[in-house]
Amino acid sequence: MRALNFTILFLFAGIACYSQPQVGLTLIASGFDNPIDITNAGDDRLFIVEQPGEISIIQSSGTVNSTPFLDITSIVNDGGSEQGLLGMAFHPDYSSNGYFYVHYTNSAGDGQISRFNVSSGDPDIADNLSEFPILTVSQPYSNHNGGCIKFGPDNY
């Protein structure tokens, strides 16, 4: 009897393994230049952070905007394998104030956190001239320059 119970248990365990849902990947957009981060602004758009210094938008339809949301390639140093535009975070009150923050490697090779504003006329375009530097951190090496920035549950 004990052997029969074990056999039945073994068979049911085998069946359970094969009844798991299948997981797959679906390509929704392509053509990015070294994408390093993806986030949203609390709406249906996806913002793709690209290491050379652009942030692109994927609309809910899957269409990638032809004009980048932000283009700071002229001030980003992406010469090292772990340098460049490294992260982005939207202010918790972004829908009201239009602030977002980026972390990038500046021309001196230092880590730079800056605030930018969305343009007043188009929610899909940032105001490149609105940069407000927040923090600069010396980076003596071109690697291990992590760049993820986030707001916590306390909105800080």
Regions found by a protein language model. Name each.
Residues M1-P21:
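Bacterial Sec-dependent N-terminal signal peptides
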Residues Q20-Y156:
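Acidic, Gly/Ser/Thr-rich repeat motifs that build Ca2+-stabilized beta-propeller blades
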